[in-house]
């Protein structure tokens, strides 16, 4: 049953924060301005997070009136080392969001103040185990950018509005609010920015309904997993869905990912913090996954979910080292230079645990194209790694209307069959896009879990059948589309035609008689 109070609270919050965010940008494009709004939200969150943590510790120690926000910086310094070990970062009381905001309107050097505060937050983690999680986190928050204004005074005026606007967002108390307010607000804003940005937005954000489907497919029969990985993690929302589906603490060893775009990489790390993921429970790297993969030495991943970029160019056979790379070598051939899709599949397979599942959104062309891509499909099928192929509806993603597919990979299959599901009609139309409803998702996941066959919806293909079809993995090859044409009863139709002809003859005879009478 849906918690009405929680839903109302969420909708009210969403309306309010989008109004604030939209107002704040002024004449600046929302997509360009997102780093300021989201970065300010993060600054507020970690300020309130560390203050709440310290205050609670003092209350528990019998000091109920203590407020870290009012503490002199010199005294607070004594706790720096311990707090960095426990929280991963440190903020002086004078540099907390609430205190900087209180003086912002009268601070003629607000841009410099914020630049210093952000540098201090990043530097506080240097030399500690959390250094990688904080390094460069505020790089996209350029306080001297012309996007904020042509002069320092104009820029500071915009920064004051930013601080006040984010302060006005009803995000409640870090501990007491009914919903995961900061993380919720952050994801909502990213959804709005992505939908308004079109194609560029779709490159960093996977819609929540698709994220839910991928994660549920990857966790069928599991109550917990060791960790989750996304080789093209974007803003990280798909990674975080594992905890929402399985429950808090069900992802034992955390969240791992790689992202090539530095702005999106920073958004992803911020997203982790805003969802209260501890600094030692996530590891996001900013590198090219295909040519410079991270997490080589990590324990393999029990869950891999991803929506990698469709048919992008990559080094391929131009790089002589890649054909001997242990990720790609088993297939004996590399994905084409102009289409990296199957390179992401092979990479994911290499990183997958023996008891794990990978659910990856794919461009449909990789299911049927020939040459190198056919050879890679042959390798995947012959070695029994492909568990299921799902045809999705068109228009599910921001910035593209193509109908994508999901490929589900497993290393520990109990049969050598491939399940094909035609879910192309499992959606509802919402404004300009299609959306998967909970009912749509349940139907797909239930069919997948039971490996059930249903006419015009799913087919469990034998290995030999896939072989006979030259390793074509298009769902339409295996699941016959429902014939929606009206069935015609020929006997009934002929009788109706005979009646019409007879009636026509009667009318014609009557008309002839009338004409004869008039002429006579």
Label the predicted regions.
Residues 1-213, 217-218, 222, 280-292, ...:
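Non-catalytic, mostly N-terminal accessory regions of nucleic-acid modification and defense proteins
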Residues 2-4, 8, 298-520:
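A conserved structural/catalytic subdomain of Rossmann-like adenosyl-cofactor enzymes
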Residues 23, 165, 169, 188, ...:
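Conserved, well-folded catalytic cores of nucleic-acid-processing
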Residues 37, 182, 225, 252, ...:
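A structure-centric signal for secondary-structure junctions around beta-strands
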Residues 200-306, 311-313, 317-322, 327-332, ...:
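Conserved S-adenosyl-L-methionine
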């Amino acid at each position: 049953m849906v918690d009405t109070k929680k839903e109302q609270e969420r909708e009210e919050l969403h309306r309010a924060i989008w109004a604030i965010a939209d107002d704040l940008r002024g004449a600046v494009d929302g997509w360009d301005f997102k780093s300021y709004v989201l970065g300010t939200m993060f600054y507020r969150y970690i300020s309130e997070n560390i203050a709440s943590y310290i205050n609670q510790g003092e209350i528990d120690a019998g000091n109920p009136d203590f407020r870290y926000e009012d503490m002199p910086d010199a005294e607070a310094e004594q706790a720096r080392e311990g707090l960095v070990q426990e929280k991963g970062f440190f903020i002086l009381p004078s540099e907390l969001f609430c205190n900087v905001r209180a003086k912002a309107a009268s601070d003629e050097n607000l841009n410099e103040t914020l630049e210093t505060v952000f540098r201090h937050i990043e530097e506080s983690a240097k030399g500690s185990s959390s250094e990688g999680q904080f390094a460069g986190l505020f790089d996209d928050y350029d306080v001297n950018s012309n996007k904020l204004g042509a002069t320092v005074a104009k820029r500071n005026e915009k920064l004051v509005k930013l601080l006040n606007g984010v302060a006005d967002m009803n995000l409640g108390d870090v501990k007491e609010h009914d919903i995961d307010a900061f993380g919720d607000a952050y994801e909502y804003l990213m959804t709005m920015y992505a939908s308004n940005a079109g194609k560029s937005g779709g490159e960093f954000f996977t819609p929540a309904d698709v994220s839910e489907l991928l994660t549920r497919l990857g966790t069928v029969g599991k109550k917990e997993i060791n960790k989750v990985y996304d080789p093209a993690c974007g803003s990280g929302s798909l990674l975080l869905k594992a905890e929402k589906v399985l429950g808090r603490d069900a992802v034992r060893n955390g969240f791992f990912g790689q992202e090539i775009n530095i702005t999106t990489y920073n958004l992803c790390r911020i997203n982790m913090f805003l969802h209260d993921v501890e600094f030692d429970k996530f590891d996001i790297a900013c590198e090219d996954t295909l040519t410079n993969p991270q997490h080589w030495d990590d324990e393999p991943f029990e869950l891999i979910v991803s929506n990698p970029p469709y048919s992008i160019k990559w080094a391929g056979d131009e790089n002589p080292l890649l054909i001997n790379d242990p990720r790609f070598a088993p297939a004996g051939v590399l994905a084409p230079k102009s289409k990296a899709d199957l390179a992401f599949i092979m990479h994911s397979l290499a990183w997958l645990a023996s008891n794990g599942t990978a659910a990856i959104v794919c461009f449909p062309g990789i299911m049927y194209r020939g040459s190198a891509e056919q050879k890679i499909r042959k390798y995947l099928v012959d070695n029994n790694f492909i568990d299921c192929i799902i045809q999705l509806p068109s228009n599910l993603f921001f910035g593209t209307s193509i109908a994508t597919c999901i490929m589900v990979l497993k290393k520990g299959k109990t049969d050598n069959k491939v399940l094909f599901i035609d879910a192309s009609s499992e959606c509802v139309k919402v404004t300009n896009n299609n959306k998967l409803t909970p009912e749509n998702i349940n139907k797909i996941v239930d069919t997948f879990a039971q490996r059930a066959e249903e006419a015009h919806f799913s087919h469990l293909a034998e290995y030999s059948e896939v072989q006979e079809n030259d390793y074509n993995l298009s769902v339409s090859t295996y699941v016959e589309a429902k014939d929606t044409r009206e069935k015609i009863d020929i006997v009934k139709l002929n009788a109706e035609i005979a009646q019409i002809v007879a009636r026509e003859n009667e009318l014609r005879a009557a008309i002839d008689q009338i004409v004869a009478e008039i002429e006579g």
